[in-house]
């Protein structure tokens, strides 16, 4: 896509950062193939802003459930495009722009998803803290691409403020969103069938998934979902231990991705006073039936260690094998068993 006047300041900043980052991070990108244009459906509880800019179509206020399609495209860097190939992975989202947002009724979105998802059914993804709508669209596009979820992907965007200082406000908005998230999971299972709906949550969004699943299990104990994936889950480890027996029966599998180098989770543990589920090193032997993937051997894909699901090729490939091929941890290439329910993911040759 070509630049418009509103994009020029951001474009200039990107160019400067590209030049600096190629000096500071000389390793080439290991991300998946380029995103030229990618469209996916969304559900959101955000308010309409009335802005003509697609990325600003929704704000951070609470509202009723809406649905539609979001299209993300690459910025056209012209002759400077080769610099992007040398830039670190965590810069990739800055090379994307939300080009179009089309709001549709929920039934139309579900019909389109049914036509594109195939036999596996949809994969519902819930984002985490500090995610405005525009940033969320860009990261959702990267995650869909990295995990190869095209056609299956459905993004659930709750009204995070998109501001680093508003963590507790985001927590409140997440809890407010839980009934609609639970309703969405139930309706998807009713539409697509038993074990045909995968549910994925990242960071604070993983906490939302866990709590919503507890409500789903209470309301409909006979429901059967597919794979539940918790990426860098920002949730009290002890609370998850107590909730697990309630949600395990309704999921085909539950997989946790954790690492020792996750800085936001370390800060969350200090804030809350208890270890987080996404921190490697917890005693997970009592998490019966849960598969834990330890990513501590992977190289850092960014300054936070929190976004491996969108930047690490190895994590993307492991997710693809789990979510698309249905392979359990003991059969997936690249995993080395550590204990009864813990595997370490080895980096690929290109990471």
Regions found by a protein language model. Give the residues of each.
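Bacterial N-terminal signal peptides
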Residues: 13-23
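Lipolytic serine-hydrolase domain surface
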Residues: 34-118, 137-196, 213-227, 232-351
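Gly/Ala-rich beta-loop-alpha elbow adjacent to hydrolase catalytic centers
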Residues: 181, 201, 205, 209
């Amino acid at each position: 896509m070509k630049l418009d006047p509103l994009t020029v300041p951001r474009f200039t900043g990107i160019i400067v950062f590209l030049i600096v980052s190629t000096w500071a991070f000389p390793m080439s990108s290991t991300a998946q193939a380029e995103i030229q244009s990618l469209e996916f459906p969304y559900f959101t509880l955000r308010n309409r802003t009335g802005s003509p800019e697609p990325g600003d179509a929704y704000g951070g206020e609470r509202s009723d459930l809406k649905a539609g399609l979001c299209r993300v495209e690459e910025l056209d860097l012209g002759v400077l495009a080769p610099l992007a190939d040398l830039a670190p992975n965590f810069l990739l989202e800055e090379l994307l722009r939300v080009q179009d947002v089309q709001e549709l009724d929920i039934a139309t979105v579900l019909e389109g998803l049914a036509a594109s998802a195939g036999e596996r059914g949809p994969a519902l993804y819930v984002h985490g803290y500090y995610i405005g709508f525009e940033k969320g669209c860009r990261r959702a596009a990267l995650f869909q691409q990295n995990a190869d979820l095209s056609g299956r992907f459905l993004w659930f965007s709750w009204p995070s403020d998109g501001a680093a200082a508003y963590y507790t406000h985001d927590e409140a908005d997440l809890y407010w969103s839980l009934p609609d998230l639970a309703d969405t999971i139930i309706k998807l299972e009713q539409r697509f069938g038993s074990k045909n709906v995968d549910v994925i949550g990242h960071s604070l969004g993983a906490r939302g998934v866990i709590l919503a699943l507890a409500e789903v299990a209470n309301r409909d104990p006979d429901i059967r979902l597919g794979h539940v994936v918790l990426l860098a889950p920002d949730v009290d480890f002890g609370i998850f231990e107590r909730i697990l027996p309630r949600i395990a029966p309704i999921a085909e599998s539950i997989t946790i991705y954790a690492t020792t180098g996750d800085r936001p989770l370390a800060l969350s543990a200090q804030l809350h006073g208890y270890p987080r589920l996404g921190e490697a090193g917890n005693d997970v032997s009592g998490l019966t039936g849960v598969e834990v993937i330890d990513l501590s051997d992977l190289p850092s894909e960014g300054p936070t260690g929190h976004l491996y699901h969108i930047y690490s090729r190895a994590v993307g490939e492991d997710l693809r094998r789990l979510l698309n091929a249905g392979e359990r941890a003991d059969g997936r290439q690249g995993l080395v068993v550590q204990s009864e329910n813990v595997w370490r993911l080895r980096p690929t040759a290109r990471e």
